[in-house]
Amino acid sequence: MKAKEWREKSLDEIRQKNKELEEELFNLRMRSAAGQLESSAALGKIKRDIARAKTVLREKGVKEH
């Protein structure tokens, strides 16, 4: 998801999606440790999405205060 798409979401939606992404990252890491991960690129994609979500949360948090 692009940063522009993240910025269009509400704070609650961003927090929920971020939680889902962190759970998915955990699952991918477990699969990687077990040797069952097909593509390590998926880890990077999830990490980037989490970073984008956190960045937008911080931007919106600063604007509201």
Swiss-Prot record:
Keyword presence, Cell membrane: no
A GO MF label: structural constituent of ribosome
One GO CC annotation: cytosolic large ribosomal subunit
SUPFAM superfamilies on file: Ribosomal protein L29 (L29p)
Keywords of this entry: Ribonucleoprotein, Ribosomal protein
Gene Ontology BP terms: translation
InterPro entries linked: Ribosomal_protein_uL29, Ribosomal_uL29, Ribosomal_uL29_CS, Ribosomal_uL29_sf
Superkingdom assignment: Bacteria
Keyword Ribonucleoprotein: yes
Annotated family: Belongs to the universal ribosomal protein uL29 family.
Cross-referenced PANTHER family: 60S RIBOSOMAL PROTEIN L35/50S RIBOSOMAL PROTEIN L29, LARGE RIBOSOMAL SUBUNIT PROTEIN UL29C
UniProt-recorded name of the protein: Large ribosomal subunit protein uL29
Organism of this sequence: Syntrophus aciditrophicus (strain SB)
